[in-house]
Amino acid sequence: MLLLDLMSSPSPQLLVAAAQQTLGMGKRRSPPQAICLHLAGEVLAVARGLKPAVLYDCNCAGASELQSYLEELQGLGFLTFGLHILEIGENSLIVSPEHVCQHLEQVLLGTVAFVDVSSCQPHPSVCSLDQLQDLKALVAEIITHLQGLQRDLSLAVSYSRLHSSDWNLCTVFGILLGYPVPYTFHLNQGDDNCLALTPLRVFTARISWLLGQPPILLYSFSVPESLFPGLRDILNTWEKDLRTRFRTQNDFADLSISSEIVTLPAVAL
């Protein structure tokens, strides 16, 4: 089994120290060791094109702290250059502008489906991006924003902010994180949805990285089981594409994609 060559890459101890020294400063609690190593693996997966973005939600560290963290990793020789901190609302994402633009362009071509889970309807339903014209325009806006950044890669880790006062962040993040079937809902109906007690097929994709450490959770998303037959082609295409990209790198091993059916009394998006 090919795992990270620890002789040519930073040790786990250095990766943990890089996160704790930059993301746990001041009153913020330092992330635990397991979180630090998983975050480093996710960031490397973004740099290698295995996922478009990572949404940072470990503690209250902001964009400047994440910039320091990525620069610390680069100082260790851990990352390729060109990663970007994208701030949307109060949230920070670590993205590769090149890879995320390629992904968003595919989204505009209809490679993903959306599941409307608005609380006003009795059951979830599938809809296309053409039925969500505001969202389609938003995806195009994000592409334009990120393409502008790619012209100036002089900074080791760049940063930008998008204003999002009227965005459905659940849907936007689902797209940016590379989910093949993001959820959407009408914002004027609040955060409620129609997924309570609905059987969901939960997909997870994991990859092995550091010897002796748990695998990296690369993707985790769900689709209503009742809609799964109609979404099978899109999900199969997503899996085939992920396996193809996985074969182009040698930092990770043992890609595992699995699914299980769960039913929950309430689902928070």
Curated annotation (Swiss-Prot):
InterPro entries: DUF4504. It comes from the Eukaryota. Transmembrane segments: none annotated. It holds the Pfam family DUF4504. Belongs to the UPF0739 family. This is UPF0739 protein C1orf74 homolog.
